[in-house]
Structure formats: structure tokens, C-alpha cells
């Protein structure tokens, strides 16, 4: 039986969570998304790869590089080898192929699930960065962490209620009219101040409680797409400024 644990990831720069090739190569699924909120997620394989790299690069004076690699494989599983290693020569026999592929991956001591959003930073021209979430994301955060717990008042020690948008009858629209909060596609209206949002800021993060916004579950995907940084990833030839594979 595994011992369950969770962690909070605070990204200090735009995070690439999609495929390395974009629409120019026919890839229409540019980002890994949660099926319920259509917001970006970090696959567990990416998190495991980061831990593997840190463990391999760590300085262990009492261990050789091979011993460090073996220890990494024990904790995070044997790394999958490239497919081109199969049958590199025409003389590869079936027995040799079996020997090279049977131990490609092994069970790890540590298993990672995907990382979901809690607060999403959205750029607002002329205003501070605002952090947006929805009740469904906060509910998932509460189920995983078992909190937050109210620290003051009559309800001290109780589980905090999941905050909801101020007006449940009217969804959030991005309108071309003047209102409280301006996004890059319009204005966000129907905003009310909620003091209880401070409980939903993970401890140790630098998110300002005054810059938090909770929207409807149906609207978080649109705002999420607005907040994405559009950037095409390309690889140039070494000797000429020309994109490879084109």
C-alpha cells in the first residue's frame, strides 16, 4: 500500500504543458487538459522526469555515476529507451530483441499523478496580474489537501466553505464596456469582494489575496485560453537559419 502525499507547485515563469510541435505540423491538441474544466494539467510523467533529472545531477561523493543511475531507477522506475535501439542492425535476432526490450520499464517506488490548477494567473493590461479559479478546481484542491481550515472567528477549526461566484444566475461574459476588471478580450463584471478567499491561497506562495477572482465552472476554460502564452517551438539547422523538417 502506498503512502499518499501532495505538493504545491508554484511556477515562476510560463510553463510548457503541451506537445513540442504545434498546429503547423497538424497537431490540434496543443495542451494537456483536464477533461472536466478544460484547463491545463502537468502530466505525472513530466513531474517524474524532473525528479529523475534532479536525482541524477545531485552530487553524491560516496556513489559513482552508475550507482546513482541505479538508485534513480529504483525510486522512479527504469527510463524508457529510444525506439531506434530496436533492430539497429539487420542481423538482430528475435532473442536479442527480447533481451533489449524486456527490461525497458520497471515499477517505481514513487508514483506521480497529474498536477491540476488551483489559481491561474491572467494578465490584465494596466492592472496587476489577477489569479482566477472556479469552484470545481477549489473543490478538487479541498479533497486532496483536506483543507483549508478556518483559523479565526466562531468557525475556527472548521473546514472552509468553497467560495462561489457572486451571482450564480448570470455567467461571466467578456463585454466591450467599462467595468471593474479588464482582460485582454474585454471586461469582467459582477465582481464582489470576498474576505474568505485568503484561506484558499496555498501556504508559502506569493499570490496576493486581493488579486483573486472566482468565476463559474463553465467560464474557466475561456479565461484559461486567454491566459495562455502563444509561442511556436521550432528547431533550426546548425549551419543555416532554416526550420528543420520543413
Give the location of each predicted region.
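Basic, Gly/Ser/Thr-rich N-terminal segments that form RNA-phosphate-binding interfaces in CRISPR RAMP
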Residues: 1-246
Amino acid at each position: 500500500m502506498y503512502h499518499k502525499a501532495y505538493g504545491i507547485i508554484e511556477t515562476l515563469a510560463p510553463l510548457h504543458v503541451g506537445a513540442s510541435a504545434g498546429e503547423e505540423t497538424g497537431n490540434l491538441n496543443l495542451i494537456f487538459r483536464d477533461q472536466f474544466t478544460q484547463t491545463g494539467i502537468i502530466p505525472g510523467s513530466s513531474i517524474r522526469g524532473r525528479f529523475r533529472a534532479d536525482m541524477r545531477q545531485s552530487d553524491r561523493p560516496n556513489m559513482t555515476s552508475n550507482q546513482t543511475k541505479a538508485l534513480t531507477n529504483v525510486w522512479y522506475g527504469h527510463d524508457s529507451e529510444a525506439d531506434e535501439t530496436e533492430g539497429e542492425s539487420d542481423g538482430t535476432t528475435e532473442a536479442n530483441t527480447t533481451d533489449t526490450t524486456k527490461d525497458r520499464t520497471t515499477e517505481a517506488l514513487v508514483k506521480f499523478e497529474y498536477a491540476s490548477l488551483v489559481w491561474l494567473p491572467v494578465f490584465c493590461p494596466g492592472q496587476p496580474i489577477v489569479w482566477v479559479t472556479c469552484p470545481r478546481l477549489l473543490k478538487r484542491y479541498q479533497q486532496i489537501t483536506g483543507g483549508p481550515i478556518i483559523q479565526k472567528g466562531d468557525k475556527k477549526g472548521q473546514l472552509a466553505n468553497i467560495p462561489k461566484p457572486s451571482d450564480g444566475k448570470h455567467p461571466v461574459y467578456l463585454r466591450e464596456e467599462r467595468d471593474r476588471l479588464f482582460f485582454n478580450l474585454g471586461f469582467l463584471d459582477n465582481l464582489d469582494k470576498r474576505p474568505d478567499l485568503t484561506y484558499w491561497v496555498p501556504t508559502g506562495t506569493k499570490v496576493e489575496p486581493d488579486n483573486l477572482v472566482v468565476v463559474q465552472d463553465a467560464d474557466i476554460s475561456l479565461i484559461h485560453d486567454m491566459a495562455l502564452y502563444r509561442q511556436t517551438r521550432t528547431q533550426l539547422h546548425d549551419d543555416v537559419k532554416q526550420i528543420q523538417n520543413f
